[in-house]
Amino acid sequence: MKSNSVSESVSVLGAGSYGTALAFCLARNGNPTLLWGRDEKHIAEMAANRENTRYLPGATFPEALVVNADLEDVVAASRDILVV
C-alpha cells in the first residue's frame, strides 16, 4: 500500500501553551505536525517568527511543524487530530 502523507501527519487544534508544546514535541520527534489556533493574528505571528512568543519564547519551531489558521485545511490534512 502506498504511503499517504495525510495519514502520517498530526493536527493539533489549540495554539495555547499546552497545544504549542504538544505540537512542538510531536514535530521534534519527526512527526509532520500542523498547529491551528483561533486567533488569526497570533497564528500569523507564530508562522512568521517560527515560535510562540506568548507561551514558549525562545523555542524555535522544528521544520516539521506548520502553523495554519485555516481550520478546514488543518483537519483535512491529518488522520490524527488532537483538540487541546
Task: Annotate each predicted stretch with a short phrase.
Residues A59-V84:
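Rossmann-like NAD(P)-binding element
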Residues K2-A59, N68-A69:
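NAD(P)+-binding Rossmann beta1-loop-alpha1 motif at the extreme N-terminus of oxidoreductases
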